[in-house]
Amino acid sequence: MNLFLSRRVWFAAAALCLPVAGQVLKVESIANPSAIGSLQASWSTARDGSPLLSWIETQKDESYTLKYAIRRGTQWSEPRTIAAHRQFFRQPAELPEVISLSDGTLLAHWVESPSEGSEAEFSYVAASHDGLRWTAPVIIHKDRSMVQHGLASIAASGDREASILWLEALQGEDGPVSLKRTVVNAEGKVVKEEALDSDVCACCPTSVVKTARGLLVAYRDRTTQDIRDIAVLRLENGRWSASKNVNPDKWKLNACPTNAAAAAAQGERVAIAWFTGAQNSPRDQIVFSSDAGATFTKPVVVSTGHSFGYTSIALDAQGNALVSWLEQGGAAGARILIRQVSPAGVAGPVIQVAEGSRRSLGYPRILQSGNETWIAWTSSATAAKVQTARLVK
């Protein structure tokens, strides 16, 4: 089911600004090379630190193609194709990603439907050493049954390897859903698959980052009493920590919110932003860690109205976090908002980036690239199109 519905989108620009380390940043719309019909955008950084944007484009035969482009200086590279004529799973939370390993190898992962209209999901990975020629896509999971294997995230976990975190529902919608990790090498081959948590929230995306000590995975856990709070796992010195909640929200929900956590890391610094509906108060919160996720501060609420969640987060060089989320408001019902929060928990002013319907805005993504912070989302005033903007001095 294509969740991207038509709506009017507009951009709030130069008059909106926020202070960062004594300077003023403004929101600036930047054109990108994605075509009409593009959606499900995501960010990473290339080997040299430049912003790398990936997205899906609709083809004339109603299949989809995964593309990416890199912005260096003031110019985008020509869009390059990773995988063409595939049946990508078209759901805002299922974002394909492309990352660079330390040697410049690119790894891409994505989720496909085995057939049109199927709710089953298969997760794939492919690799490229030159950014032009890609290996044949490989399924990252051993199981091939027609169930969920998705909501994946990826991070480099070694010089020539990466870890993909994903969810597996072997018993279908009514059974427990497992959090799993697949290790892939620079050739796009699966090296290892392991289970990390046997019962998590079924339709909430994962988030994985690399800290100075190792991997940190943030996800929405689930207890037998249907408490759905955010938890983290840490991989240090080859061993996984026990699962730990970042905050006891105690959100009880006998359903799946399709809303999880977003994590960002910079050395020992970690910041996590997430949505909760606990106490019948829909809101977005953020916590910080100065010890790679071993401990966290008390949460700071960043949303100011009725939040829909779908958070994204980035950390700047000073340790300030920039958080984006969707909130109720505007003529079409929803707005993309961003806000800076200092490591001390001081929240800056709220900035509106765009407005539209809740579903059609997609899952906005934030990236920190050097001194620049970027955001991507989907607009469809007439047809779906990936939009990008940055915060500039």
Residue ranges and their predicted role:
Residues 2-11:
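Bacterial N-terminal signal peptides that target proteins for export
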